[in-house]
């Protein structure tokens, strides 16, 4: 079981992908995080690929937990958000102040201060264009939808996903429904209706993704499956005739052998390929909005590999010297880097003879996650493996680069303060 609130170390990514059905990242997005396979997995990324190829609208959704520092370890999610925004995605960002109150006891006032000072100003400084940033506690649409989603799940499911026990308070138990509503509310009618939605996450957040994807499907009238043929079934106990006829008419305009069955509440169609499913799902979702306010497309997700902390393990706010905060003074960041662990050998002679081990080196991770020059990063990797690079040189070089970047970010952060009203929606 994965705990999305307290995962403290690395995962066996391939085992998790097999166990929970996370697919390989198979769409070649032109961003270094994807090119370097730092984004290891995906769910339904074909919906985003379809939207891009057909010039359709799509949503980009993420959230922030206002409980600690924004650091390089969680920065890559925003790097992806900015990348997808440049491709045309409509960005929404939730400040999880209700979740931070329920799971970590942080007051709403403190959460607001942390969200703005530690996160939102940095997002803008990094290049995020105006978008919708909101606080859970002030968004009535999210609260309403969370209430409605509660009618589509039960305690047995939540115990299975999260390990909840009788000692967990109801606010904590409700937090996953709030998070599901954060993502799904972007497809409500007032926000433009059904649309592909991508959520960049770490593997530790997969329980949330599984729940919200299941909830999205349960809110639909139509359920779509491809067996030997396409099967569109109608959920519920109401008379299905109107829905069956609508799906039948739609599919008959595209395929030749289409049959409907009122008794079994299904429409079947031959000759449908796997690649047709995305378009069919999107079309039926839009048709369904005539009858259903919650005709959601199950959200897509990208799964990123965790960044190593400078003291080993994953980069985490619980070990201050293991992370580089985006609010760190450049001198402090330099100190942390120079004191960081490496993948080097015990002596210079061994390093030259045996080569270093960049794959387990936190210093190399700084290059890999933060430097967009593919050629230089590959050169650093190869020279380390071949014993041509010493750890001290790498530390000094990346410390200089990070100090310069943090200094520039600090200036942009102050400029961003004047633009907050373009982002925060209340």
Curated annotation (Swiss-Prot):
Gene Ontology BP annotations: tryptophanyl-tRNA aminoacylation
Cross-referenced Gene3D superfamilies: HUPs, Tyrosyl-Transfer RNA Synthetase
Pfam families on file: tRNA-synt_1b
Catalysed reactions, semicolon-separated: tRNA(Trp) + L-tryptophan + ATP = L-tryptophyl-tRNA(Trp) + AMP + diphosphate + H(+)
Sequence motif 'KMSKS' region, residues: 314-318
Subcellular location: Cytoplasm
Protein's recorded name: Tryptophan--tRNA ligase
Originating gene: trpS
């Amino acid at each position: 079981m994965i705990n999305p609130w307290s995962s403290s170390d690395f995962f066996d990514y391939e085992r998790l992908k097999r166990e929970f059905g996370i697919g390989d990242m198979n769409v070649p997005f032109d961003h270094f995080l994807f090119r370097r396979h730092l984004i290891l997995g995906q769910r339904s990324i074909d919906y985003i690929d379809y939207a891009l190829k057909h010039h359709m609208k799509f949503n980009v959704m993420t959230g922030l937990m206002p409980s600690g520092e924004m650091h390089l370890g969680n920065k890559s999610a925003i790097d992806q958000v900015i990348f997808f925004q440049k491709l045309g995605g409509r960005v929404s960002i939730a400040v999880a102040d209700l979740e931070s109150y329920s799971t970590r006891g942080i007051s709403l006032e403190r959460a607001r201060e942390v969200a703005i000072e530690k996160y939102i100003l940095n997002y803008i400084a990094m290049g995020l264009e105006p978008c919708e940033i909101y606080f859970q506690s002030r968004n009535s649409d999210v609260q309403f939808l969370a209430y409605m989603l509660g009618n589509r799940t039960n305690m047995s499911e939540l115990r299975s996903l999260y390990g909840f026990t009788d000692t967990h308070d109801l606010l904590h138990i409700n937090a996953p429904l709030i998070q599901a509503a954060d993502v799904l509310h972007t497809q409500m009618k007032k926000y433009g209706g059904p649309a592909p939605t991508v959520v960049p996450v770490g593997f530790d957040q997969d329980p949330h993704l599984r729940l919200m994807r299941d909830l999205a499907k349960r809110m639909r009238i139509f359920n779509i499956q491809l067996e030997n043929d396409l099967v569109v079934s109608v959920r519920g106990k109401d008379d299905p005739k109107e829905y069956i006829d609508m799906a039948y008419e739609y599919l008959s305009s595209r395929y030749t052998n289409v049959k409907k069955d009122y008794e079994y509440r299904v429409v079947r169609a031959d000759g449908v390929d796997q690649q047709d499913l995305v378009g069919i799902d999107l079309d039926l979702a839009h048709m369904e909005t005539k009858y259903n306010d919650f005709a959601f497309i199950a959200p897509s997700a990208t799964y990123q590999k965790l960044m190593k902390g400078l003291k080993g393990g994953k980069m985490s706010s619980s070990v201050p010297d293991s992370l580089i905060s985006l609010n760190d003074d450049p001198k402090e960041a330099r100190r942390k880097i120079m004191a960081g662990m490496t993948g080097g050998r015990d002596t210079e002679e061994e390093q030259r003879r045996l080569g270093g081990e960049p794959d387990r080196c936190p210093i190399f991770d700084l290059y890999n996650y933060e430097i967009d020059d593919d050629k230089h990063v590959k050169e650093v990797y190869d020279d380390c493996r071949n014993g041509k690079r010493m750890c001290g040189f790498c530390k000094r070089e990346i410390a200089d680069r990070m100090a310069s970047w943090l200094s520039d970010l600090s200036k942009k952060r102050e400029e961003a303060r004047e633009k907050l009203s373009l982002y925060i929606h209340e």
